Amino acid sequence: MKSTKNCVRIYRIKQDLTFVNILIVSNVNSEVKMIYNNVLDAIGTTPIIKLSRMVDEDSARILVKFEGLNVGGSIKTRTAFNMILEAEKQGKINKDTIIVEPTSGNQGIGLALVGAVRGYRTIIVMPDSVSEERRKLVKHYGAEVMLIHDAGNIGECIEECLQTALRMQRENPNVFVPQQFENPANLAVQKNVTGKEILEAVDGPIDGFCSGIGTGGTITGIGEALKEKNPDITIWAVEPEDAAILSGGSIGTHIQMGIGDGLIPPILNQNIYSDICIVKDEEALQTAKDLASKEGIMCGISSGTNVAAAIKLAKKLGKGKTVVTVLPDTAERYFSTPLFED
């Protein structure tokens, strides 16, 4: 007679943005499957990966949370969904609502995705300096794209995108602008979900964290979650050299898309970080390329920015410590950029 064994498995069931651990005792020969009601229920639980070939022996270990494997290909799907979810709960939007948002890319893709699933018409207002792939992805989800010319100052262009969206809201009562730069639902999901995922996954104390700043939601939300667990953690903000507004630098145009929008976001907690690391375009590009060729991780340019800073932080903290950062998106939306030039 063939014997069987019971095994214990923990399955994580998604309910909106909260996971519930369910303990299941099952026969090893049985098969348990999870079925999501829609793609939004599959958001999150992205892997944390230890970098093996890009870190010196005398440095802290570097762990990266790879959001390129998230639904929609970026970390911004989390924030897009939570902003819309909260707006629905508060009665701010209905079936006739038109979602309009100014963005340099990934938030727009996330909102287009959420709009497709929830049935909202979505219009994304973007600088014309963002990659062609980002525009096409927004359109592919069924949303509309409005382009604003970037004349060499990304801050001024983002401001014009915002004013365009707000003007549309004044002219049409059905228009809802999520306002990612000041929406508390943005940082809430990063603190309560993304930050929690990191804390649950990492085996031991987290000594350092660094992140580029777009809306400020990632560094504020995750940073606050990590700091509550370890008040002595070292947190660095990261800026592109050509948009180092926190450092008092001049504002131009750069290729580290998704961060360095030339403004200080209202939701950014400027007390959460102790230092600012400035990264040049060339350094961000090379680091992103190294992540592919040395670690097998296909990620975007701002991922290179974050890891370039993480390498510096890891050297400062030294062996035996742990540094965490985020890889915000996937490389496939950068084919037309210098990331894929020889």
Label every PLM stretch briefly.
Residues 22-24, 28:
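Intrinsic disorder/low-complexity segments in short proteins, especially the signal peptide
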